[in-house]
Amino acid sequence: MINISLSDGSVRQFEKGMTIYEVANAISMSLAKQAIVAEINGELKDLSTVIENNCKLRILTAKDPECLEIIRHDAAHLTAEAVKELFPETQVTIGPAIENGYYYDFARDKPFTVDDLAVIEAKMQELAKKNEKVTRELWNRDKAIEFFRSIGEHYKAEIIASIPTDEPITLYRQGNFIDLCRGPHAPSTGFVKYFKLMKVAGSYWRGDSRNQVLQRIYGTAWATKEQLDHYLFMLEEAEKRDHRKLGRELDLFHFQEEAQGMVFWHDKGWSIYNIVEQYIRKKIRKNGYTEVKTPVLVDKRLWEASGHWEKFRDNMFALEADNKILALKPMNCPCHVQIFKQGIKSYRDLPLRMSEFGLCHRNEASGALHGLMRVRSLVQDDAHIFCAEEQITDETVSFCKLLTEVYKDFGFTDIKVKFSDRPEIRAGSDEVWDKAENALKEAVEKAGFTYTLNPGEGAFYGPKLEFVLTDAIGRQWQCGTLQMDFVLLEQLDASYVAASGEKKRPVMLHRAILGSLERFIGILIEEYAGCFPLWLAPVQVAIATITSDLNDYALAVQKALIDNGVRTDINISPDKINYKIREFSNHKVPLIAIIGKKEKENKQVTIRRLGTTDQQVLSVKQLITLISEENSKYL
């Protein structure tokens, strides 16, 4: 007999040599029916696994989050099985689970079409309903290679040949389909119930553009119908909110081939950009930051001294002038250190908070570019805090407070913090890392945040905090960072005079709240679905006349608004008022000021707010006051 410790804390005895499924069935027949995989001593296993020794056992069902990846991997195999039945000449390659779904890469001469996807999905439903048994088989390496070659699956044969000789070769069989896989998998195809094929894209064998072009089918799979429906709804919402689409529709910005990854800001988009910058500038000034400006083009000698040339060279744009190699800066920190080094710094000067809206350039691969979210030319709301070790906690608490205020003003209240601690390869002593990590942890807790730990994910030069926002449709965006740095000031020989009179190295805190302005504006466009709050809207008030004889009054109202800093648009054309209202509403202007004869007589306007038919009559002065008061809260 063997002792099995179960997840409820009980310990039960079973015959040695029973499978996990048999144990589950002995506990409860309903549990055995629902079981997908199990965890033995922390390792996921198939239900067919034989238990030979005492162990800790967790039997997992669709309710357990660990099973979602299993279901998605099962769905990938089901996709491959369906493709092989429908298109037997197609070769299968790999099909992993990924975030929110899975993909499977196929080699075939003819691309899959949208119609093909519908047929494949229908076949998958059919195979799932058959509830085919899934079995794990251990194969001899040479036999497996020979088998896959014999059935024309040369990619699978190549994968097996590349597996280290000390690793077992395991295949999974379901119906007439067999695939190479480490597993584990559910006991039958019937556990894959709620899925959808999403799209087809091109890929390369082993991710190398020199290799064969493959056809990648993306799918999504979930444990329940509700989860699937929610995900599809979220995708639909995300498509409606896509900042690239709204950027065109609202005339905010565009991109073109002649300047890949560089934004062409239109007047309305640039207005938003400047408002965001103005807002951040006001916040940091109130929090004791100085603002500086450093060169965009810097001799490579500085990048060599800082270590960036060695580690970041491939992502830097460089050029030659006057027999020197110059590089467009990819980040601001080495330049900020140069300002810190001008003149003697004393402990009385610390903490020194140095900010810059620094224009940076990064040579991102063209395939990685994605609207405002991933660009080659970007401006960061970057700052570096030079402080003494004993000031780290207070500075971090202060930063967390500022960051929370900023996010709240933009409508983000769900903030998660990730703490990345020391990696295996790192600079500095364990004692220094202990101090740094403890200071950050203490600060985060003082600021009222809980955090999740990313073990070993800190940079080699210091631990890091990452701040993650959740948007209106549940997506998460990592924006803010606070990174401690023990190395750069050593490399660039920056110091201050301590109270004792000796020279000491300050600690450097790299920090950003928005990240890049471009990306954050992209997030804002999607968060608000283009309907910006009044203080942030590129056009705050649009004036629409009912008849042409009111144009002079409308122009006078516009001038009064502009003179008081209100961003306005106007339509005094002969078009009907309903058309004007519809056009301004389509451009998501928060306030529409309607002017008719009565409004002119009373020196008033009738205000209609975006998204409602309710109307409010205001004097021009009242309208200016309303907007000015709203602006003053933020700007």
Curated annotation (Swiss-Prot):
Keywords for this protein: Aminoacyl-tRNA synthetase, ATP-binding, Cytoplasm, Ligase, Metal-binding, Nucleotide-binding, Protein biosynthesis, RNA-binding, tRNA-binding, Zinc
Enzyme Commission numbers on file: 6.1.1.3
Descriptive protein name: Threonine--tRNA ligase
Family: Belongs to the class-II aminoacyl-tRNA synthetase family.
Cofactor note (record): Binds 1 zinc ion per subunit.
Organism (species): Rickettsia canadensis (strain McKiel)
Gene name linked to the record: thrS
Occurrences of domain TGS (ranges): 1-61
Gene Ontology CC annotations of this record: cytoplasm
Quaternary structure annotation from Swiss-Prot or TrEMBL: Homodimer.
Stated role: Catalyzes the attachment of threonine to tRNA(Thr) in a two-step reaction: L-threonine is first activated by ATP to form Thr-AMP and then transferred to the acceptor end of tRNA(Thr). Also edits incorrectly charged L-seryl-tRNA(Thr).
HAMAP family: Thr_tRNA_synth
Cofactor requirement: Zn(2+)
